[in-house]
Regions:
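Bilobed "Venus flytrap"/periplasmic-binding protein-like clamshell domains
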Residues: 1-9, 135-141, 147, 153-166, ...
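Short, solvent-exposed loop/beta-turn-alpha elements that line the ligand-binding surface or hinge
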Residues: 7-15, 53-65, 71-86, 122-137, ...
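Short, well-ordered beta-strand elements
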Residues: 15-22, 148-157, 178-179, 192
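Periplasmic binding protein-like
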Residues: 33, 38-41, 45, 164, ...
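Periplasmic-binding protein-like
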Residues: 79-120, 162-163, 254-259
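Structural transition elements
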Residues: 94, 107, 111-144, 156-162
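Bilobed periplasmic-binding protein-like "clamshell/Venus-flytrap" ligand-binding domains
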Residues: 103, 141-161, 237-274
Length: 297
């Protein structure tokens, strides 16, 4: 991509040529940015384990608190699914120590959130608190649910192995075993799903709808007429100041229903060469409008 010298905003005039390399492997890209030779200046989607292992005098890890969310989607579509019972879903939420998951599964690179929206963001409901850990109560409910073989199949990718191991350790305390299954299949009880809000101020349309709406890509439960009605009300409300109370109500509704295992908001990590000044965006989108070559480089 070449800089547009005719760009209308002189204060934000692009000044660098941008080359995207989607062929190079992640490991080679990290080695290249660490070398500082200018072949690679920014590596996106860096994992916590990669960030912890990254050492360089020529580059650094840049962290952004983007509008991301990681949840476990309960599979309510299975015949005789125990997750159709709201008490069982809530019990699973009470079985998890989220702070410990953040440390062991993400190396500390995440923010604790009660549901789907981060504190301070549009629609955040400050009346909500993350589900409190109560292993004793959770264990009683989950035992009574008679989950087949007392085993929870967790859909997770290899890059989520540390998180899976941390969840396994915690669920053992409430009498449950785990097994890791392909997240692309349907043979899961709980599937780990990462998503992000790329919108300016429309989290319900971009995030909540994907998990709970009738046309949601991640929905693994029967249609929820109550959620769809609340979403329709939001769509029929033109003024932003009138929308926010509705968003807060929707956030509380999905929290109470517990149709997902609420976890946290992962940080977005980049490996960035000292040659460039890089500004990450909180939408998670890779915007390079403010990226510049540092003088003297």
């Amino acid at each position: 991509m070449e800089p547009n010298t005719k760009y209308w905003n002189k204060d934000r005039m692009p000044s660098v040529r941008i080359v995207f390399d989607n062929i190079i492997s992640k490991s080679d890209a990290l080695k290249a940015v660490a070398a500082g030779d200018g072949k690679v200046d920014v590596v996106t989607m860096v994992t916590p384990s990669e960030a912890m292992a990254f050492k360089s005098d020529n580059a650094k890890i840049v962290m952004a608190k983007a509008k991301t969310v990681l949840v476990g989607v309960f599979n309510q579509n299975k015949p005789d699914s125990p997750w159709k019972d709201i008490k069982v879903r809530q019990a699973m939420n009470m079985a998890i120590d989220r702070k410990a998951l953040i440390e062991k599964g993400e190396g500390g690179h995440a923010e604790l959130i009660p549901a789907m929206i981060q504190p301070g963001r549009f629609g955040y409901n400050d009346s909500l608190k993350p589900y409190a850990l109560d292993a004793s109560k959770a264990g009683e409910v989950l035992k009574a649910a008679k989950i087949p073989d007392a085993t929870v199949a967790i859909g997770a990718g290899e890059d989520q192995k540390a998180l899976f191991d941390a969840m396994t350790e915690q669920l053992a305390k409430v009498g449950l075993k785990t097994k890791m299954v392909d997240p692309k299949g349907d043979d899961f009880d709980v599937k780990l799903v990462w998503h992000f809000d790329w919108s300016p101020q429309f989290p319900v349309g971009v995030v909540h709808r994907e998990f709970f709406g009738k046309d949601g890509a991640f929905r693994a439960m029967p249609e929820d007429p109550q959620f769809d009605a609340m979403f329709a009300k939001l769509l029929a409300t033109p003024k932003l100041e009138d929308q926010e109370p509705i968003v807060r109500d929707i956030e509380k509704y999905v929290y109470d229903q517990a149709n997902v295992l609420f976890l946290y908001s992962p940080h977005t990590l980049y490996a960035v060469s000292n040659r460039v000044s890089f500004q990450p965006y909180d939408t998670f989108m890779l915007e390079l409008a403010e990226t510049k070559i540092v003088k003297g480089q």
